[in-house]
Structures are given as structure tokens and as C-alpha cells.
Amino acid sequence: SLKHLSQKINKKEQEDDLYRIFFYDCAPLEKKMHNPISGKSIDFSKSEEAIFRRDLHQKLIKTRKLALRLGKLSEKSAKWIFKPEIAEKILKKQIDIKSVGENDVTIDVRQKGVDMRIALDIASITFKKQANRIVLVSGDSDFVPAAKLARREGIDFILDPMWQKIPDDLFEHIDGLRSTY
């Protein structure tokens, strides 16, 4: 977020230079699968999410000072699962599995390589001294080893968890916490 470029120090507005914004994602699921409940064929390449993400990626690669880093989607491991709230109700015997409908399942697919790309970029920026501050906008803690490395090398490491609560032990691995939106 560009709002991280300005901050108040001693009640004065300070602007930082932007080295680059790195955007990490993976291509959307493009395969066709059949819903296990209804048997209906679903072409995920035509879903609203797939269309949105392809369009977003095209816009991002044309944006100045922005690097799009794409991991891989593990399409072979894509499988149908019960939505978490449905699985919980089945396990608690609140609903019978025979009453499950086609909208009670969702596709489960994993992205590969995104965490590694984040860590490599943080390490590269750190060792090449391309920035003195890194702001990571993330909702998970997979970045901890890279953040530790950056901090040991003198980088001011800020986490923007997008207003999500973070575990207390995560504070020891960052220099600051700041959500902007």
C-alpha cells in the first residue's frame, strides 16, 4: 500500500522513496471439474474470480515500479471439500450427509512457490541494500525467517496484517505493525 510511504515522525510528515512493490499471487484455476454432489460441469477458467485475476495481473504488469511474482497452482491436487461450516455440522451430527447440496462443497487448490518467492525477494533486497524499509502486507506468518534475516541486516521490517489480529510471539520478528486500510 502506498500509504506506507508517508509517516509522521516528531509530528512532521516524512516521505520515503519507493523501491518497488512486489505483488505475489498465482494464476487462477483454469480446469474443468464436476461438482461431486450435482455432477454439474464447472469450467473454472470462466469463473468471475479467474476473469478478475487474469485482468488484474495484466494491469499489474503494466504498472510502474510494480513486480508481479506468480507462484504455481497445483491443479493436479485440486479437489472438492466440504465448506468448513458444513464439515463441522456433519461432524457434530447436526446435519446428515445426505442433506448436503451442491453449494455445500468448494474446490480446494494449493499455490506453490509464493512463500519462497517472498523470502528470496526479501533476502535479495536486504543483501543488495536496495531498501532500508520493507513493508509486508500479509495475513500469515510464513515470512518469519526472511523477516529475521532482514532485521539482522538492519532493515526496518513493518508488517501490515490488514487489520487482522496477529499472535503475540510474532511481534519479536517485526519492527512495527501498521494497517493502512
Where in the sequence are the language-model features?
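Nuclease catalytic cores that cleave nucleic-acid phosphodiester bonds
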Residues: 70-181
